[in-house]
From Swiss-Prot:
PROSITE patterns: LIPASE_SER, PLAT. Its EC number is 3.1.1.34, 3.1.1.32. This is Lipoprotein lipase. Keywords: Calcium, Cell membrane, Chylomicron, Disulfide bond, Extracellular matrix, Glycoprotein, Heparin-binding, Hydrolase, Lipid degradation, Lipid metabolism, Membrane, Metal-binding, Nitration, Secreted, Signal, VLDL.
Length: 478
């Protein structure tokens, strides 16, 4: 008799554990139309514009009342934010910032934050493996919303950071219909660089997949962010390696000022920059940063890729043009070290002339640009080689919009060490014209010396060039 009582008591406790979960809601209600949602561990918080930092209301798959209780807007688009690996087991500070920026740009939208913190706090390889289960959770949730409420998945935009980008990709591959867009914010590299498409973010996971790569420094498979292109458009700001303001010198300065408590922030500075670049695109919609298609970052650094013909340039971030090429498009741009991140790109071409054949390596120069709106002075650049009667192309950028170019100054910087030959006779070149192309406006300008030729000497005064007045030159420059 006593054993039967104990058995009934144990059975009662077991049934109670099945039927009570998540704020007292009954788990049995999560069996809807023959589908069991009780295996979903991820939580889906619909945050509000008034409280972007707290998960105050959860949408629970299988519990239809939760959708009404959270005031889900069925007629608006939905953003689903998926965080990455975490050391602390808490949301990182960028999450409420992204939520706030999304609501500021799309006030009537739904912004859902996926909580998989318990799985994301494990050792990295374990958390990386969990992205498959998290992706399955998100897919089940989205399919339920589509089936139960006829909510169109074409209104869904998934945004995943680091490991969350791959979870977003897996989710997109498992939904009954494709979601509209997935944005990968520096998708994680380790365990995914050589993974097959079904196990990571890929172009097939949504109608359009765009990716920002901001921390790809290191050998493939060991860099924090994935190196290879995994979307329809893959953008590599500042080459995709280190980001401005995230260098070692900055790290030492911050440690000296704030102590070692911020070391983890510095380690992920470039990684997390992907999120802040996207936030910038939401808040500064009238001035989107422009990226340019290029075969390599080396060619981009030479200024050879500032063309916008045939979709060769695109906006970075929220206002990207959804161009779906057969092959993934790798694009590059420069940015500032802080918001707003937009800069203005220029290709500069200089022909160095002379009667004597000379070659100099690793030469430092400064150029100053003057326009109708502002000027940008003493912009440093280095040419790996300068030889007589050769033309060199390189990339410059300014942090301010200087308007239409009117004039420029060019200076050849003297060596930091003393040289008897330079003291006795400074080397120099004749320069007749300098060609400049503005990436943002696509305008080309040819600058001429005030004389027929200007003699540029190392360590001497800068040489001034003004816009050429020859109409035929202007026609050729486009």
């Amino acid at each position: 008799m006593e054993s039967k009582v104990l058995l009934l008591l144990a059975l009662s406790v077991w049934l109670q554990s099945l039927t009570v979960s998540r704020g007292g809601l009954v788990a049995a209600d999560r069996i809807t139309r023959g589908k069991d949602f009780r295996d979903i561990e991820s939580k889906f918080a619909l945050r509000t514009p008034e409280d972007t930092a707290e998960d105050t209301c959860h949408l629970i798959p299988g519990v239809t009342e939760s959708v009404a209780n959270c005031h889900f807007n069925h007629s608006s688009k939905t953003f689903v934010v998926i965080h990455g690996w975490t050391v602390t087991g808490m949301y990182e500070s960028w999450v409420p910032k992204l939520v706030a920026a999304l609501y500021k740009r799309e006030p009537d939208s739904n912004v859902i934050v996926v909580d998989w913190l318990s799985r994301a706090q494990q050792h990295y390889p374990v958390s990386a493996g969990y992205t498959k289960l998290v992706g399955q959770d998100v897919a089940k949730f989205m399919n339920w919303m589509a089936d139960e409420f006829n909510y169109p998945l074409g209104n869904v935009h998934l945004l995943g950071y680091s490991l969350g980008a791959h979870a977003a990709g897996i989710a997109g591959s498992l939904t009954n219909k494709k979601v509209n867009r997935i944005t990968g914010l520096d998708p994680a590299g380790p365990n995914f660089e050589y993974a097959e498409a079904p196990s990571r973010l890929s172009p097939d996971d949504a109608d359009f997949v765009d990716v920002l790569h901001t921390f790809t420094r290191g050998s493939p498979g060991r860099s924090i962010g994935i190196q290879k292109p995994v979307g329809h458009v893959d953008i590599y700001p500042n080459g995709g390696t280190f980001q401005p303001g995230c260098n070692i010198g900055e790290a030492l300065r911050v440690i000296a000022e704030r102590g070692l408590g911020d070391v983890d922030q510095l380690v992920k500075c470039s990684h997390e920059r992907s999120v802040h670049l996207f936030i910038d695109s939401l808040l500064n919609e009238e001035n989107p940063s422009k990226a340019y298609r290029c075969n390599s970052k080396e060619a981009f650094e030479k200024g050879l890729c500032l063309s916008c013909r045939k979709n060769r340039c695109n906006n970075m971030g929220y206002e990207i043009n959804k161009v779906r090429a057969k092959r993934s498009s790798k694009m590059y741009l420069k940015t500032r070290s802080q918001m707003p991140y937009k800069v203005f790109h220029y290709q500069v071409k200089i022909h160095f002339s002379g009667t004597e054949s000379n070659t100099y390596t690793n030469q430092a120069f400064e150029i100053s640009l003057y326009g109708t709106v502002a000027e940008s002075e003493n912009i440093p650049f280095t040419l790996p080689e300068v030889s007589t009667n050769k033309t060199y192309s390189f990339l410059l950028y300014t942090e301010v919009d200087i308007g239409e170019l009117l004039m420029l100054k060019l200076k050849w910087i003297s060596d930091s060490y003393f040289s008897w030959s330079n003291w006795w006779s400074s080397p120099g070149f004749d320069i007749g014209k300098i060609r400049v192309k503005a990436g943002e406006t696509q305008k080309k300008v040819i600058f001429c010396s005030r004389e027929k030729m200007s003699y540029l000497q190392k360590g001497k005064s800068p040489v001034i060039f003004v816009k050429c007045h020859d109409k035929s030159l202007n026609r050729k420059s486009g």
